[in-house]
Structure formats: C-alpha cells, structure tokens
C-alpha cells in the first residue's frame, strides 16, 4: 500500500481552499451577459471555446493532490446543480467559493465550525423560503423566451426558438438539440406520435411524390406477435372492408402469405392497408404498443390477456385522424384515445422516470412521454465553424434546461437581484449562539457575490452597483447587458427559481462540509527509479555492417 500524506487543521484547510479558488476563479469569469470565454485544450482537433461553467469545471484537474480534493468538491457543486436544475453552475460555484473563504476566516479566528455550519443552514433555509414567496409562475411565451435568452448568455434568438418549440409541442413535450447544416438556427416539429419503423413493403406507398403511405381516418390493429397466416387476419379484414376505412397493422412482424395478401388487396384497391413492425424490443415493445393503444383508443391484441387475432372486433381497433408511413418512420396524428387515459399514462411514466437509475432508461421513458404528450421538436443549431457549433449547442442545451426549470417552479428577478431581496429574511434569523450568528453573516455576504461578479465581468465597480441595488426594492436591479438600472422583470432579465434555489443549497452543502473538515489524507507522489542505462556494446552495433 502506498504511503499517505496526512494533514491536519489549518495546514489541510489552506491547501483545500487553494484548490477551491483555482477552480472557482476559472469558472466565474464566464458569469453574466458580458462573461468572458474560456478556451479548453483538446488532445486532437481544435480547442473548445465555452462560456459554460460546468464545462470549465469538468476540465480542471490539479497536480497537487490536496488542492485537487478542494477543486473536486467544488466541481461537485457545479455538476449537481447542472443535473438538478440544468443551469446555474457558475452561480453555485461563486456562492460556494464565497462561503468557504468567509467561513475559513471565522474558523481561523477560533469559532466552532459545527455552529458556523448550523448558522449557514438556517440562513439558507430562510432565503429558500423567501425565494418561493418572490417567485412568479412562468406561463407566457415571452417569459420563456426571456429566461432562455438570459441562460444562453443574452442570445435572444436562442430564447425565441426555445419558446417557439414549447408553443408547438407543449411544456411537457420533448425538445432535442442537434447540429444544423446552415448558418441559421432551425426548428423542426413532428406532431403526434412518431416511431422509427417504416412500411414492410414499398407496394403500400400511395403517395408517389412523398414516397409515403398516407391514410386518413384509419383503423389501427395492434398485435404483439408475428402474423404469417392470413386466416388469422381474415375476420378483421372483412369487418374493416365493410366499414370502408383503411387499416394500419402494427405487429412484431408481418410476412409470408399474410404480407402478400395485404399487398395484393392494396394494389387492387380492395382494401387500403399498410403494415409496420412494432418499435422497440422485449418489454419496451410491449410498453410502446400499450402507449399506442391508449393514444388511439384501441386494445393490444395479446394472448397474455386472453385476446386472439381471429376473435378481434372493430371495438378492439384504435382510430386516428391520419397516419403517415415513410421508409423509416411512422407518424400517428390525432389519435382517438381518451384524454384522461392519456394523462394517466403520462403520470405513470413520470413515476417510472423518478424511480429508474439508468440514464438510458430515463431517456427512453422521456421519449415515450413526449410521444404521448403531443410531439417532438428538434432545434438544429446553425454556425459557421465546428468550434462555434459546439459552443452554441452547449448554450442552447443550457437555455433549454433553464426554461424547463422556470416552467416547473416559476421565475424570480435575474442578475443576482433575487438573492439580495431575500437578504432581509436571512438577516432576521437569530442563531442559538454567537458562532451561529457568524454563520448567518457568512451567507449574507456570499449572496452579494453573484451580482459582484457579474458587474466585475462588465468592467464596472461592484460595490457601487451592489449598494445602489440594495437601496432599491422589489424588482429593481442592474441590467449588466445594457449597463442600466431598472425593473429586471420589465427588462426581461429573469432567472428560474429552481436554478437560484438549487445553486444556493448545493453551494452551502459542500461549503459546510469543507468548513467542518479537520484532516485530509492523500497518496504521496512516488519517486520513480531512473531507467536502466543501455548495456555495453549495444551503442552503435558497429560489427553489424555489410561486407
């Protein structure tokens, strides 16, 4: 086992704080509308340029083991805030740095670290409650656009395209971000439920221009097994033919004489049909068929529940206003399912999302939820170069997370103003002793720090601006983008409540752990023995020349 470097007391804390400051100083230059870029080296290809705090934090690894432990703990603040709220990583880092540095001064003065931590926790709880009171619901498209643009470093077009996407697919709908092919950002919306399976035979195509099978007001047969024998299918085909409607078949597979008969009927115009494979595999396929059944008001014909294909009736079939089937995708538009049943299914999927631990499973469940909720929007990010594309794409993803957080918990005035307005609630808190009061004071100083850093990145004097904002009330604050004072909400400078709350709670949590640390243990660097010199006579291998 390798020897360890064990440090106690101030010796340990000083090294840890040094690591905290290196990481936080690198991250905080990105804060605010006039935040600076950070360039990250890559082992191959062009370097990455970013204004995303968590991207900068993830790159930092320090040579000194003890300093690195401090840096990694603050990195955890940024990562956790990003995971929960999707934004606010730089704010969380700035808050953590301030609480740690202020707290260490009191610890060095001989105060009890545990009481300091209790005081910090009391102040944070009071501020969190005050933020909830200040918070307003984020409902309008304009507010969503404003939140998105602030999170994307004051890029208004990004905020607008996210607001448009949410208008199209709803606040519960899935919005994905992809690389675009041009210079401008584009928004593609797929309405209804789309899955990645196409027609089983090109003979089902009835629209030559689009190379698609398009059916209006069809019946939809959902079957969880393979269909090869046409006799099993005949009773359903006869009932649908009498009704004079097209038929869409979604099954594990359709082949042999069953597929041949469907194709012949389709070509002759006897019965307009189309067959596709069910999406997914195993249990996920069953779940997606069940989703389709709920969306279309039909039933999955499955032997497990005592249903068979021969005995299926029109009541077992789903309905939709329109179905479009391409070579690789099928879209069900305006299914005839019951609205309450669809909401119930979405609630059930939401519960599963909370319980699963795998990111892959979570992503697949969110896709299913989106398909039920009414569509998928794809934002295609345009840029002139690949470096710009990566940077812009990261900002769009940040903005998307921020708008979702705003819809979930509401909005507060941005630019660090909400924390300052919550200051009075924390100032009224009295600790059980003098040391706890000092913990409250640490937080009161720390919550000024985000605004100070925003102003500093603008090149202005932080203390002057902070004092002027504190003299005002309500939404009065400093718009760093335009260097103007005024109503932050009216100027469209908004932050999601969830982002501000999460940033403060995570910062206080990690900072509290650091203040109560009294010992650090790290591996000592090993002294590697020098390499063995080459053996004698091997130098120039002179005797090996050709005669």
UniProtKB/Swiss-Prot annotation:
Signal peptide: none
Binding positions for ATP per the UniProt entry: 30-33, 51, 87-91, 415, 495
EC id: 5.6.1.7
Subunit structure comment from the entry: Forms a cylinder of 14 subunits composed of two heptameric rings stacked back-to-back. Interacts with the co-chaperonin GroES.
Function: Together with its co-chaperonin GroES, plays an essential role in assisting protein folding. The GroEL-GroES system forms a nano-cage that allows encapsulation of the non-native substrate proteins and provides a physical environment optimized to promote and accelerate protein folding.
Assigned keywords, A-Z: ATP-binding, Chaperone, Cytoplasm, Isomerase, Nucleotide-binding
Catalytic activity entry: ATP + H2O + a folded polypeptide = ADP + phosphate + an unfolded polypeptide
Isomerase found in the keyword field: yes
Species this protein is from: Thiobacillus denitrificans (strain ATCC 25259 / T1)
GO cellular component: cytoplasm
Family per record: Belongs to the chaperonin (HSP60) family.
Protein's recorded name: Chaperonin GroEL
Example of a GO MF term: isomerase activity
Any GO BP: protein refolding
Species classification: Bacteria, Pseudomonadati, Pseudomonadota, Betaproteobacteria, Nitrosomonadales
Gene: groEL
Subcellular localization, as worded in the UniProt entry: Cytoplasm
């Amino acid at each position: 086992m390798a020897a360890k470097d064990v440090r106690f007391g101030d010796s340990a804390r000083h090294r840890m704080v040094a690591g905290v400051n290196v990481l936080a100083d690198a991250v905080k230059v990105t804060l605010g509308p006039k935040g600076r870029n950070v360039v990250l080296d890559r082992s191959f290809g062009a370097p990455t340029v970013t204004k995303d705090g968590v991207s900068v934090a993830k790159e930092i690894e320090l040579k000194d083991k003890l300093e690195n432990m401090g840096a990694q703990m603050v990195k955890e603040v940024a990562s956790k805030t990003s995971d929960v709220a999707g934004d606010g990583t730089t704010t969380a880092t700035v808050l953590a740095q301030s609480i740690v540095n202020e707290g260490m001064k009191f610890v060095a003065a001989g105060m009890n670290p545990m009481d300091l931590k209790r005081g910090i926790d009391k102040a944070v709880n009071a501020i969190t409650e005050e933020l909830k009171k200040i918070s307003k619901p984020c409902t309008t498209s304009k507010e969503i656009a404003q939140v998105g643009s602030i999170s994307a470093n004051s890029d208004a077009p990004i905020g607008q395209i996210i607001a448009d996407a949410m208008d199209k697919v709803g606040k519960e709908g899935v919005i994905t971000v992809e690389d675009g092919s041009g210079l401008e950002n584009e928004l593609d919306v797929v309405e209804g439920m789309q899955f990645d399976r196409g027609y089983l035979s090109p003979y089902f195509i009835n629209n030559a221009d689009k190379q698609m099978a398009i059916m209006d007001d069809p019946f939809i047969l959902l079957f969880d097994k393979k269909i090869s024998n046409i006799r099993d299918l005949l009773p359903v085909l006869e009932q649908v033919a009498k009704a004079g409607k097209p038929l869409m078949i979604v099954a594990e597979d359709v082949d042999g004489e069953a597929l041949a008969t469907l194709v012949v009927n389709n070509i002759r115009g006897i019965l307009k049909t189309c067959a596709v494979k069910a999406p997914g595999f195993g249990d996920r396929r069953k779940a997606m068929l069940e989703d389709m059944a709920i969306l279309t008001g039909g039933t999955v014909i499955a032997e497990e529940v005592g249903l068979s294909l021969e005995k299926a009736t029109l009541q077992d079939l789903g309905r939709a206003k329109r179905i479009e089937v391409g070579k690789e995708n099928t879209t069900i538009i305006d299914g005839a399912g019951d609205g309450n049943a669809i909401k119930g299914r979405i609630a059930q999927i939401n519960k599963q999302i909370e319980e699963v631990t795998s990111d892959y499973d979570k992503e697949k469940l969110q896709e299913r939820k989106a398909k039920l909720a009414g569509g998928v929007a794809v934002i295609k990010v345009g840029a002139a170069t690949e470096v710009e594309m990566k940077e812009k794409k990261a900002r769009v993803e940040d903005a998307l997370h921020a708008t979702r957080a705003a819809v979930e918990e509401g909005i507060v005035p941005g630019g660090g103003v909400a924390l300052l307005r919550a200051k009075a609630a924390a100032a009224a808190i009295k600790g059980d002793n003098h040391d706890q009061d000092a913990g409250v004071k640490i937080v009161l100083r720390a919550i000024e720090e985000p605004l100070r850093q925003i102003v500093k990145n603008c090149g202005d004097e932080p203390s002057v601006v902070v004092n002027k904002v504190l003299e005002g009330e309500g939404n009065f604050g400093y718009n760093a983008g335009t260097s103007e004072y005024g109503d932050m909400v009216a100027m469209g400078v908004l932050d999601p409540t969830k982002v501000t709350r999460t940033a403060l709670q995570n910062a206080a949590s990690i900072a509290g752990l650091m203040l109560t640390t009294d010992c650090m243990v790290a591996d000592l660097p090993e002294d590697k023995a020098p390499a063995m010199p080459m053996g004698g006579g091997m130098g120039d291998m002179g005797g090996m020349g050709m005669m």
